Amino acid sequence: MAQRFITLILLLCSVLLAPHSAQSSLFGENTSFGAKNSQSRFIPVDQAFAFDFHQQGDQLNLSWQIHPGYYLYRQQIKIVPQQAALGAFTLPEGITHHDEFYGEVEIFKQQLTLKIPITQAAEQASVSVTYQGCAEAGFCYPPETRVIPLDVVVAASTASGTAAVNSSATVNPPATTQPEGDATPVPSTLPFSPLWALLIGIGIAFTPCVLPMYPLISAVILGREKPHSQRRILILAVVYVQGMALTYTLLGLVVAAAGLQFQAALQHPYVLIGLSVLFVLLALSMFGLYSLQLPSSLQTRLTQWSNSQRGGSLAGVFAMGALAGLICSPCTTAPLSAILLYIAQSGNMLAGGGTLYLYALGMGIPLVVVTLFGNKLIPRSGPWMQYVKEAFGFVILALPVFLLERVLGDVWGLRLWSLLAVAFFGWAFVLSLKAHAGWVRVCQLLLLAALLIVARPLQDWAFNGNTQQNAVKHINFQPVANLPQLQAVLAQAQGKPVMLDLYADWCVACKEFEKYTFSDDKVQRQLANTLLLQADVTANNAEHATLLNKFNVLGLPTILFFDSQGNEITAARVTGFMDAAQFLQHLQNTPAVTK
């Protein structure tokens, strides 16, 4: 018994002493261990975002269990039905996350659950669910698309008017993964608060096409026999404004609903650029370059119809207000068109209807005041009304800057904001020169100070741009589009080691690599004798999926190294972000990469 016990102790000691040498013999010469270790920090997408779904009659339930240290982008979640119609649903509010390259975005952590009503589903109906997320450690997964088969759902007679909703969300059955080409975030809310529409409406009321008409409109509202009760006058004025607000609200809902059906397409760079051009043209009409309004024949017909209503009655006044919303003057057409275009681009029905309602309410507040108190509180007409109109031209010009910022990035976005601010303060300063009051001199000094402050980004661009460009020299990569092209380049590498950078616009850490790591002088010198390739897999199409699957790439950033014979040096693979010092150390520890 004692002998067996001693033998057991000796065996245990041998096991405890063995691991170091055993590990050396097992993995010391195995190059694939390095690649496996480089990816061990990150888990497969199915584990990072564990997805489950089930259908209960006319309801589809989607849920995600998000691994600690990982997150999903709210704006990247999309749901598209095929041969089915979905009822209205909304994504829950996410956690605000600041991104250096994309600004403020919303993300989901830990868990996400969606309940989506199904109004109709034919045989072989399905729902495509797309999502995309990242690891907090600096690693992003390509957009994932899953196809969920649906059971048949017969449309109810009461739901015949329900429209299909193409929205956004997530799924993960591994057998039906499909690459998704469009991964552009779709904003679900307006960057402008709808309350701004109230202020814009009040401001539009003081333009030369609107303010002089208010005394006439108030007389029409009250009718031939002016009511003696102030309460009655207030009710009539408010009813008129509500009629006008109804028209604008319906316009907002219709335009937002139309935009919702094409929400993803409206985020395409070409569409954003086209909308920006339209906004600029609308702004030019506010500066007096041309007049924009409804055809005169249509305006005349609407005016006659409005005049046929009986003033002084609630129904007649409400109808006049509703028709007045359709009669756009040159001062109101451009702002209204700009708001409608922007609402269509956002696709948010609640914000769309609310924004137009507040806009009409803002225009109606001065009218209510005029109707109650007469012309006493109306400012005297003059050139200042034209200046108000021109000021709203600058407000409209802010919209294309918002849209172009998504296409051009933060750097050029800041320059566009600076250019717009310089134009506005310069215009205000020139106007102030026409006044001679003493307090205007103080305003002029403030305007000049503001002009210098807002011009700073343009100054940096003009005077420091060349210096910064010379100081920060980015690596010039040779692009490769697919696996056959990569194999051809490797075959013609002429004995040089090769580095392949897998890049995508939706990969935040890829942009960090470009900005902080590849721009480093020491890193560039270390890679001087290396053939540098880059594959842009932003579109995530079939060719890109083939390339990523060939090298078992989980996500980005991933950097592959190949020796002079075109074989991957798996131990040198980089997965996840490395700063310049870490990447340089990695290169120096792998002599075969940069020999």
Curated annotation (Swiss-Prot):
Disulphide bonds in the chain:
C134-C140, C209-C331, C507-C510
Q: Specify the enzyme's EC class, one word.
A: oxidoreductase
Stored InterPro entries: Cyt_c_assmbl_TM_dom (IPR003834), DsbD_gamma (IPR035671), DsbDN (IPR028250), DsbDN_sf (IPR036929), Thiol_diS_interchange_DbsD (IPR022910), Thioredoxin-like_fold (IPR012336), Thioredoxin-like_sf (IPR036249), Thioredoxin_CS (IPR017937)
**Keyword Cell membrane set for record:** yes
Q: Name one GO cellular component term.
A: plasma membrane
Q: Does the keyword Heme apply?
A: no
Membrane-traversing stretches: 197-217, 233-253, 270-290, 311-331, 332-352, 353-373, 384-404, 411-431, 435-455
EC numbers on record:
1.8.1.8
Keyword list, A-Z? Cell inner membrane, Cell membrane, Cytochrome c-type biogenesis, Disulfide bond, Electron transport, Membrane, NAD, Oxidoreductase, Redox-active center, Signal, Transmembrane, Transmembrane helix, Transport
Read off the CDD domains from this record: DsbDgamma (cd02953)
* Signal sequence coordinates: 1-24
Q: Which family does it belong to?
A: Belongs to the thioredoxin family. DsbD subfamily.
Name it: Thiol:disulfide interchange protein DsbD
